[in-house]
């Protein structure tokens, strides 16, 4: 289904003009050239239409207070595993590097270590910053490589430095919320057997003055993971699983984390979702967070990561790109001819229902399906006459839901009768 701008939605022109810069203008032209004017206009609406619930004020009201953070610092857990944060760093602006390290130092959970691999041997500013923090905090350790080995091998060198029971992945220019590790260890108290965890995230501007695009994720969903790397940040996994999975693989550079997450979840027992925004993905000119087209090769690597996962798990499926970068479709072969049940809740909608049924019949090549219409307190004679007309169609079944409208309950009711 194609996206459409919301009817009557108005672009906040003042907000848009405030954000104009040579970079954002170039980015806009790139997007329009790649996707065309229609998709560009849709994206413009998505980005600058007024939000029903503006995220910025919600975020500021949502973050824990200093009093809450101080209470967390005093919390003693029965299970307090060492969490190692692995960071491959390459030509990191020193301001970003400091902010990343500081986001660990202010964590309300204290049993952590930060393992940074510096692949910029000639960057003296980075060397000074890393030496400064390492000297001032024993939990901050770093290793200088003689040369840049690439993102996969740099990360593996960081993995090799870790001593913790769990390992978390943090990009060199991103930030953790101060309660990130606390919330992870808190959920581990009730699920000490969990092998992997992931959190919600948002994006933040280069200057850290605006949070936007929150990504509130579902619990672990393998089918969704096969369509896009929805887990992404912040991902924490037992080191034993890292060792079993084998670390990052350079042949998947650009989507090395996607491939890694697949292999970790394949080897993990319980995978937990921590429903808190605990990771802040910084956007800037070279960041895929703000400019997906800056790493086009990454999306082909993502496709190969899914294909490799399907092969390892013995799952037959054909993987293809979609028009949205980083999103994929897996087309599975149909096994036999299973019955498909189509559920349609309805109240008094004769014309809409008739159109729906006609389109199903016209556009569906697969014929082994049934249609379950759930009648919900209709009052017009017209709809009941139409139900009577449909009674001769053996594919159509009519159920009655006499309670008040509840979309989820109605569909669950129909599914039980499918």
For the regions a protein language model found, what residue spans apply to each?
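A recurrent flexible, glycine/aromatic-enriched loop bordering the glycosyltransferase active site
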Residues: 152, 160, 204, 210-240, ...
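Donor nucleotide-sugar recognition loop
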Residues: 246-262, 297
């Amino acid at each position: 289904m194609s996206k459409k701008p919301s009817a009557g939605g108005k672009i906040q022109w003042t907000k848009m003009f405030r954000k104009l810069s040579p970079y954002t203008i170039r980015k806009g032209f790139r997007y329009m050239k790649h996707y065309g004017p229609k998709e560009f206009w849709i994206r413009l609406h998505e980005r600058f239409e007024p939000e029903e619930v503006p995220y910025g004020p919600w975020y500021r009201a949502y973050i824990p207070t200093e009093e809450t953070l101080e209470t967390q610092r005093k919390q003693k857990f029965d299970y307090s595993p060492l969490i190692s944060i692995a960071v491959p760093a390459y030509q990191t602006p020193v301001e970003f590097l400091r902010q990343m390290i500081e986001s660990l130092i202010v964590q309300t959970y204290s049993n952590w270590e930060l393992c940074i691999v510096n692949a910029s041997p000639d960057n003296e500013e980075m060397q000074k910053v890393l030496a400064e923090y390492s000297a001032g905090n024993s939990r901050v350790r770093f290793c200088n490589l003689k040369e840049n080995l690439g993102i996969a091998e740099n990360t593996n060198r960081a993995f090799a430095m870790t001593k913790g029971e769990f390992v978390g992945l943090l990009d060199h220019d991103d930030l953790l919320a101060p309660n990130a590790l606390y919330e992870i260890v808190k959920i581990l108290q009730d699920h000490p057997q969990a092998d992997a965890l992931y959190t919600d995230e948002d994006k933040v501007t280069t200057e850290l003055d605006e949070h936007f695009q929150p990504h509130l994720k579902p619990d672990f969903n393998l089918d969704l993971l096969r369509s896009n790397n929805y887990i992404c940040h912040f991902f924490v996994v037992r080191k034993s699983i890292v060792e079993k999975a084998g670390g990052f693989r350079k042949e998947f550079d650009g989507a090395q984390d996607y491939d890694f997450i697949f292999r970790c979840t394949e080897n993990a027992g319980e995978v937990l979702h921590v429903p808190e925004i605990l990771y802040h993905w910084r956007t800037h000119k070279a960041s895929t967070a703000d400019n997906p087209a800056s790493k086009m090769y990454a999306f082909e690597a993502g496709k190969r990561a899914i294909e490799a996962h399907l092969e390892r798990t013995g799952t037959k499926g054909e993987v293809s790109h979609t028009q949205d970068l980083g999103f994929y479709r897996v087309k599975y072969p149909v096994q036999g001819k299973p019955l498909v049940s189509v559920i349609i809740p309805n109240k008094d909608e004769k014309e809409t229902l008739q159109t729906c049924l006609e389109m199903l019949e016209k556009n569906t090549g697969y014929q082994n399906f049934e249609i379950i219409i759930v009648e919900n307190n209709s009052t017009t004679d017209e709809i009941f006459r139409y139900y009577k007309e449909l009674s001769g169609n053996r594919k159509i079944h009519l159920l009655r839901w006499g309670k008040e409208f509840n979309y989820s309950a109605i569909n669950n009711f129909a599914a039980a009768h499918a």
